[in-house]
Amino acid sequence: VGVVEQLRKRLRCARCGAALEAETPDIACSRCGQKYFRLGRIPVLLPRPDDHLTLWRRQLGLLMAQSRQMTGALEAEAGNPELAEGAKLRLNALAHGVRDQLRQIVDVVGSALGGPLEPQESTGLPRGVVEYSYLLYRDWAWEKAGNQECQQSIDSIRSVVTTEKLGRMLVVGAGACRLAYDLHRFLGATETAVVDIDPFLFVFAEAIVRGAVVQFTEASTTVQELSRIARTWDLTAPDGPLGEDVFHFFLANGLSPPFADGTFDTVVTPWFIDQVPPDLPGFLTAVHRLLRPGGRWINHGPLIYPVDAPISRRYSREELFDLVSRAGFRIEPWRGDSQRHLVSPLTERGKMEWVLTFEAQPVK
């Protein structure tokens, strides 16, 4: 369902590595019997899919509880008769923004998950909402207000690729998916698979790529003017929808994507290799095995490592290139640029990041 025959035959079980049967609504492994479900229309190809669904529903429950607590606290504070009218307006506007944002997340993601579950003490908030929700605004809305970060990324990649014929492409850690969408549209991809482990971004992205107009409210506590406390954006695919026959979503482990060796002409890692792989050389081996002979790997992102990463593994560009060479790749053109990152038109705040972009081809 939703996967063309060629790629469907290349899917592999996340548990045992055997071929998957993907022609029925429930995907099943012919060897170990593991069954996989779909979250909405997205196959969940993770080793213990039911456990992940339970976690996601508990995260949704925690998000709902904390958002309602925050909204109640803001409204209670706004009810203080000693507050100035401007402060009351600001607090109430922020409360409305938080409430709208929660409602939109529940409408889009909650319905796909099957609703919330009571969180456990160990349950944490979903990173897709807490840390990465701004990617949805940036990818699918801010461009209408003049933000050029998406164009900046595609221009950087276009400047290093040796040919604009990406063929069958895998994007690992695709997040909100605008880069994957643009690469497919403009750099000659014939079929694209996107992989991520976070449904809170992916369910939004899948709806947008398929052609839906999704509303999502941006709210900020860092206020310069009362008119900039919150704004509801229309998230849309700027160049029209992409269908299930050419653009495929998979909730799966990006460190071990569930595909047979030699499946892809191009593998893309956007803002991924510095943050996610605990064993970067091991991950490079996985990238190598996924590429067919003559394929290429495209990387685009900074070198910003987790705070708990050993300093010895916070590789410089030169060290990274040495690891890439040892993994059997040849680096083609590359560039490093300081680029604007998540500069919101609402707040006019954001970051500058040094971003490394390169193409590498397997040589053995």
Map each language-model feature to its residues:
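Conserved Class I S-adenosyl-L-methionine-dependent methyltransferase catalytic core
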Residues: 37, 42-160
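Conserved class I S-adenosyl-L-methionine
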Residues: 165-175, 193
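Conserved SAM-binding loop of SAM-dependent methyltransferases across substrates and taxa
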Residues: 176-188
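S-adenosyl-L-methionine
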Residues: 209-255
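A short acidic, Gly/Pro-enriched loop at the edge of an enzyme's catalytic core
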Residues: 252-267
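A short glycine-rich, Lys/Arg-flanked "PGG" loop and its adjoining helix->strand segment in the class I
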Residues: 281-293
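Conserved beta-strand signature within the Rossmann-like core of class I S-adenosyl-L-methionine
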Residues: 294-303
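Core SAM-dependent methyltransferase catalytic element
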Residues: 327, 340-364
